[in-house]
Amino acid sequence: MTDILMKIQDALMNDELISKHFERKDIKFFVYPNANDIISNVIVIDEIFSPSRSDFADNNPLTYDYLFQIDVFVKQKNNNVNGSLLSRELILRVSKIMWQELGFGEFNSFKPEYNQDFNLYQASKQFRGKKYIDEGLL
């Protein structure tokens, strides 16, 4: 079995733009860091619901249905990088990777946020997709 979360992380880290702004340790699963603890950019991949069986044939499930939320946090530092623009660029790149590499389409998009107390931009989207059970993913 292959962990679908690791497959998402690998797809993100194999992208030139994402790997320029994030290290593997900056991609978290399920646990959202405290805003005060974020010192660099962070991505959080959160599974909204456990995989559910779908697309049945002869009463046997053919696919797993997934729903993930991915949040991109960009720390605005005292440099020439526009954190707001970068957070939008990164979440759009995540969306492209999720579709082209994994076949997960955008399910929902959220209002971008800025936490002034911590100079932190956040962009979030949800992605839904199916994988055939025989692909060995879980």
Where are these regions (language model features)?
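Mid-chain, well-packed structural core segment of small domains
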Residues: 64, 69-92
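Short, surface-exposed linear patches
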Residues: 50-52, 65-69, 93-101
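Broad gene-expression machinery/nucleic-acid interaction feature
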Residues: 40-42, 67-69, 122-124
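Small/polar-rich, solvent-exposed N-terminal microdomains that initiate assembly or binding
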Residues: 1-56, 89
